[in-house]
């Protein structure tokens, strides 16, 4: 927070979207951003990054003053909440579990808005969604496409007009897919993941540095991470076509299957009352999935390049 003013020096806040990530000091960060912005309305897609449910999923507590933060968000023209699927993905959740969690968390925030008299149409504009993107290209494409379909259904049931059933979707390359051994392979993983997120309909993508599992990323890895999205947009033209995977039987089938599985997980969570009440049982199911995946890796039934396949014997 102390370095926020230095970080944003020279940034055109009405042009470049800014999203805060300050879970320990959300109010101080928001107040600092408001002071920097002054009378300027933030660019579309900006947000305060508040995610109390995600913090609960990670075993942390949120003491944010939501009422005061909501007032700042309204003044800045920024989104208040982020619905972050990486909170469960990083613990080993399957794609369906991540979708179910994101839907349930999103509905929880809609209810919080409704408790304060905000209608669903306006409330939906206060949310940003995040999904993890892995090197499993087609499942990642299908997951991003499925979320748009499922959230559209939630908004339909909430009475939101069709033309306003929009979704701001941000992709983050997966942390669990990264390997400490032969970390250069992580560049291939993150490139495929970023490509899949873009093809799946992400509005923006964060590419993690390839050496992040080793500690503080070096300048080369940070530069490569920043440039990956630019190369995919400017040279591969990923952003030129809307839904380029649409119509492909394989992708449509995967999307339908994931949408059904994600909705089933969502209804299972809702049957327990609310995402906060269902979180312990959801995390228990996530742990089971993670345990099975670890066993598959240990038995080489799930190969990892540079680790269990083609390892660098001199590393």
Residue ranges of each PLM-predicted region?
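Flexible, glycine/charged-enriched surface loops at secondary-structure junctions
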Residues: 115-126, 155-167, 204, 235-245, ...
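Glycine-rich anion/phosphate-binding loop at the beta-strand->alpha-helix junction
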Residues: 106, 130-225
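Structured core elements
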Residues: 19, 82, 128-130, 168-171, ...
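Catalytic-core signal marking the mid-to-C-terminal active-site face
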Residues: 223-315
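Mobile "lid/hinge" segments at catalytic clefts and subdomain interfaces of large enzymes
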Residues: 74-110, 191-265
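Catalytic alpha/beta active-site cores
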Residues: 1-136, 167-170, 208
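Conserved active-site and cofactor/substrate-binding residues in soluble primary-metabolism enzymes
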Residues: 2-3, 24-31, 61-68, 94-108, ...
């Amino acid at each position: 927070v102390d370095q926020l003013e230095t970080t944003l020096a020279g940034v055109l806040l009405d042009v470049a979207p800014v999203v805060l990530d300050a879970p320990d000091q959300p109010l101080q960060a928001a107040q600092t951003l408001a002071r920097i912005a002054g009378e300027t309305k933030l660019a579309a897609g900006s947000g305060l990054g508040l995610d109390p449910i995600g913090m609960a999923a990670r075993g942390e507590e949120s003491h944010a003053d939501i009422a005061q933060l909501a007032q700042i968000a309204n003044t800045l023209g920024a989104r208040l909440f982020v619905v972050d699927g990486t909170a469960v993905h990083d613990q080993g959740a399957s794609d369906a579990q991540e979708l179910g969690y994101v839907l349930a968390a999103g509905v929880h925030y809609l209810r919080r808005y409704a408790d304060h008299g905000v209608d669903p149409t306006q409330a939906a504009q206060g949310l940003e969604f995040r999904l993890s993107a892995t090197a499993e290209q087609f499942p990642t494409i299908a997951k991003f496409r499925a979320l748009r379909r499922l959230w559209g259904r939630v908004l339909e049931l909430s009475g939101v007009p069709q033309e306003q059933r929009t979704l701001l979707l941000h992709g983050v390359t997966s942390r669990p897919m990264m390997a400490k051994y032969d970390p250069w392979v992580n560049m291939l993983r993150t490139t495929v993941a970023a490509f899949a997120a873009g093809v799946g309909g992400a509005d923006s993508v964060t590419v993690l540095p390839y050496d992040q599992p080793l500690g503080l990323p070096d300048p080369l890895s940070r530069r490569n991470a920043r440039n990956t999205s630019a190369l995919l947009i400017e040279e591969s033209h990923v952003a030129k076509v809307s839904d380029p995977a649409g119509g492909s039987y394989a992708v449509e089938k995967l999307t339908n299957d994931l949408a059904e599985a994600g909705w089933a997980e969502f209804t299972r969570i809702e049957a327990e009352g609310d995402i906060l009440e269902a979180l312990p049982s959801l995390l228990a199911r996530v742990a089971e999935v993670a345990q099975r995946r670890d066993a598959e890796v240990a038995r080489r039934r799930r190969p990892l390049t540079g680790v269990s396949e083609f390892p660098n014997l001199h590393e």
